Amino acid sequence: MAVHKEVNFVAYLLIVLGLLVLVSAMEHVDAKACTLECGNLGFGICPRSEGSPENRICTNCCAGYKGCNYYSANGAFICEGESDPKKPKACPRNCDPHIAYSKCPRSEGKSLIYPTGCTTCCTGYKGCYYFGKNGKFVCEGESDEPKANMYPAM
């Protein structure tokens, strides 16, 4: 009888461990299946946090990206950007001396992606805007960005 209980316990333990391995593997699988052909994109814009109180950026509220907030060197809120990357406003190129840095919903990675390589709308990152070689807006990316250092070195 004791052997039967030990076998049941080991079998139960193996099932639980197997389910844990399966669930952890599923977390790393991108649910979006994209085709393998390359897109014909010219460049991409990904609004990102930029600058710091010590390393100021040169922009103004008109030219700043919608969804990004702009701050002074002492951290006071100045404005939210007014320019939509899909339809940029005609804005002056002057630097607002009050703006030191920006905070955007996404802060990792490059702001300008050029060239885009083999990126398509499907493989492009959410929150990034992709344009054709003629400069016209094509699409917003559809895939989640990979988390930085997802598999750290051991």
From Swiss-Prot:
Cysteines joined through disulfide linkages: C34-C122, C38-C118, C46-C128, C58-C95, C61-C79, C62-C91, C68-C104, C121-C139
Signal peptide annotation: 1-25
InterPro entries linked to this entry: Prot_inh_I20, Protease_inhibitor_I20
SUPFAM superfamilies, A to Z: Plant proteinase inhibitors (SSF100897)
Alphabetical keyword list: Disulfide bond, Protease inhibitor, Repeat, Serine protease inhibitor, Signal
Single annotated GO MF: serine-type endopeptidase inhibitor activity
Origin: domain of life: Eukaryota
Pfam families, per database record: Prot_inhib_II
Gene3D superfamilies documented for this protein: 3.30.60.30
Site (Reactive bond for chymotrypsin): L36, E37
Keyword Signal belongs to the record: yes
Keyword Signal annotated: yes
UniProt record similarity statement: Belongs to the protease inhibitor I20 (potato type II proteinase inhibitor) family.
Descriptive protein name: Proteinase inhibitor type-2 P303.51
Native species: Solanum tuberosum
